[in-house]
Amino acid sequence: MAEFVRAQIFGTTFEITSRYSDLQPVGMGAFGLVCSARDQLTNQNVAVKKIMKPFSTPVLAKRTYRELKLLKHLKHENVISLSDIFISPLEDIVLRWGCSYFVTELLGTDLHRLLTSRPLEKQFIQYFLYQIMRGLKYVHSAGVVHRDLKPSNILVNENCDLKICDFGLARIQDPQMTGYVSTRYYRAPEIMLTWQKYDVEVDIWSAGCIFAEMLEGKPLFPGKDHVNQFSIITELLGTPPDDVINTIASENTLRFVKSLPKRERQSLKHKFKNADAPAIDLLESMLVFDPKKRITATNALAHEYLAPYHDPTDEPVAEEKFDWSFNDADLPVDTWKIMMYSEILDYHNVEAGVAAMEGQEFNGQ
């Protein structure tokens, strides 16, 4: 059994295996605290995320289980990868397990911090957007919608390598998908208008908002609230077409949209005066009201603007779709705990098998 050590970070106890040392806080969110650490086994810096009280409710239990399943399944250069997961011996798996620890790569910074510190030059904007779309092509091919894409969920290292992270809100591709998700500035209009019938296109809209922010140096649609957010969008992109308005299910929302003054779509080249024509063309194809007319990640990669980096032989898709069979399950917390424990055991068994195979190959050389 692994030896565990304790550390106090911001008043929170981290009980981790002795494999990890030099814990330093790097971020805190609604669901957990993230620390950097040194992996003694690989001599690499890693991020250790402690998920607080993941089994306090069935909803949070499913969220934690979903994030682990996704991290195990998604294996791509532009998606954050899982390198370890464990529970502390103080937490009882059946009765009161109150935390779990996910260990992933540590990239040093995120796009939000970069954007608030300095303007980005064209080649960096192109390279970052290329990697975002390359990651989305893979994620979408796995049957997964991120749903909460924003600059703080885009991690970057000193080599400008980029990885999409935080799949806690990710969902199955589902034409009847519902829910109030995503940070408002980057939220697609179909989520605000209908709360239903949305799919992978919501991530393309979010990526378009991030692209615009990289070009402009500030958020494109900084709405103060739900209503103001949509109004700001129409000021730039004009009134939604009738076929989009007709999909609105809520009478109150429909009444609000129809009450707005008729607006014409503004030319993005006047808004983004320093952007070249290919950048404007790609941005316009991403920020389209009708999700079915929005460009796909695959087609965006082939766009002229991303030509310096586009390589169709090195933009892989998922080998198989993600298994969402658990997602509609309405299970008690104890069942989610057992399922989570099973996934952790499976992860370590697979990792041990891979290590053994690599050892055999090495010894056979």
UniProtKB/Swiss-Prot annotation:
Residues 20-306 form the Protein kinase domain. A motif (TXY) lies at residues 178-180. It catalyses: L-seryl-[protein] + ATP = O-phospho-L-seryl-[protein] + ADP + H(+); L-threonyl-[protein] + ATP = O-phospho-L-threonyl-[protein] + ADP + H(+). One of its GO terms (cellular component) is nucleus. InterPro entries: Kinase-like_dom_sf, MAP_kinase, MAP_kinase_CS, MAPK_Sty1/Hog1, Prot_kinase_dom, Protein_kinase_ATP_BS, Ser/Thr_kinase_AS. The active site is at residue 148. Its main location: cytoplasm. Its cofactor is Mg(2+). GO terms for molecular function: ATP binding; MAP kinase activity. Disruption phenotype: Leads to reduced growth rate and conidiation but shows increased sensitivities to SDS, Congo red, and hyperosmotic stress. Results in reduced expression of the stress response-related genes ATF1 and SKN7. Moreover, NaCl treatment fails to stimulate the accumulation of sorbitol and glycerol. Reduces the expression of the ustyloxin biosynthesis cluster USTA gene. Finally, reduces toxicity on shoot growth in rice seed germination assays. Belongs to the protein kinase superfamily. Ser/Thr protein kinase family. MAP kinase subfamily. HOG1 sub-subfamily. This is Mitogen-activated protein kinase HOG1. It comes from Ustilaginoidea virens (Rice false smut fungus).
